[in-house]
Amino acid sequence: MVREKVKVSTRTLQWKCVESRADSKRLYYGRFILSPLMKGQADTIGIAMRRVLLGEIEGTCITRAKSEKIPHEYSTIVGIQESVHEILMNLKDIVLRSNLYGTCDALICVKGPGYVTAQDILLPPSVEIVDNTQHIASLTEPIDLSIGLQIERSRGYNIKTPNTFQDGNCYPIDAVFMPVRNANHSIQSYGNGNEKQEILFLEIWTNGSLTPKEALHEASRSLIDLFIPFLQAEDENLPLENNQYKVTLPFFTFHDRLAKLTKKKKEIALKSIFIDQSEMSPRIYNCLKKSNIHTLFDLLNTRQEDLMKIEHFRIEDVKQIMSILEKK
């Protein structure tokens, strides 16, 4: 088990794994923190992340079993201790890991007597078993057991219905494609008054097909993919093709206008006005904050060349900043 002391950054937004352990092959646990966050942000991120962790991450399951010797789901087979229904439930619990797209076939072909476990499943190279010891059936007599399996990668869950019984010898299996067993978030506040900030604690339990850290990365990518269209909407709605006629703000204009603004304002006043008191968009605010620009004085003493080196910062943001500063 890995466990670390929680150290909170006072400036740059950071995430960290503070605890990680494997309770068994099919139960992993991870605890993460994200800080510092402004009041209200931790709950927003925590709720969104939990929903994505539990509903959007893909998993791999056995979704169908087929055997010529099985008359119906609730029958028993001579020489097998478990009923057909129990065998199907055991197959449902098998935890798989894969980079599969769509479906594939697998096979169980065993001669008794003996125990049939997950390691007896013949799989394609793209699929692997997390726990080879998972029990499937007990053969009490020297019989041949042959079961064809269908394996699928998807998300959420798939509950069988009467309509899914298409073949008399083919039995659909309830599939739960969610590799994250549970996810919780909690919030700790610190600071006073307007300086109050939050720490987000995120706990993740997985079934072993991926680690909590991998689950967190996948959930983050899923959320990013959801929001990217909003970032592109402004460009796509412009009437000009490829936006080839966008006007950029010359560097010398930026410097000249900043110099005039600085002369008009007292240095003490500028140092006491924080950027979060201005009408900047959250994206611009976060970009500036990550670059240790906290007050208007810091901003007015930053060259445009340096601003444009900030990750995700654009020339349109410079125009917006100039417009805001001229109102001060």
Curated annotation (Swiss-Prot):
| Pfam families the UniProt entry points to | RNA_pol_A_bac, RNA_pol_A_CTD, RNA_pol_L
Q: Where in the cell is it found?
A: Plastid, Chloroplast
Give the top-level enzyme category. transferase
Taken from the UniProt entry, a GO cellular component term is: chloroplast
Among the record's GO biological process terms, what is one?
DNA-templated transcription
Gene3D superfamilies with a match to the protein in the record? 5' to 3' exonuclease, C-terminal subdomain, DNA-directed RNA polymerase, insert domain, RNA polymerase, RBP11-like subunit
Q: Which GO terms describe its molecular function?
A: DNA binding; DNA-directed RNA polymerase activity; protein dimerization activity
Q: Where is this region: Alpha N-terminal domain (alpha-NTD)?
A: 1-234
Q: Where is this region: Alpha C-terminal domain (alpha-CTD)?
A: 268-328
Q: Which reaction does it catalyse?
A: RNA(n) + a ribonucleoside 5'-triphosphate = RNA(n+1) + diphosphate
> What job does the chain carry out?
DNA-dependent RNA polymerase catalyzes the transcription of DNA into RNA using the four ribonucleoside triphosphates as substrates.
Q: What is this protein called?
A: DNA-directed RNA polymerase subunit alpha
Q: Which gene encodes it?
A: rpoA
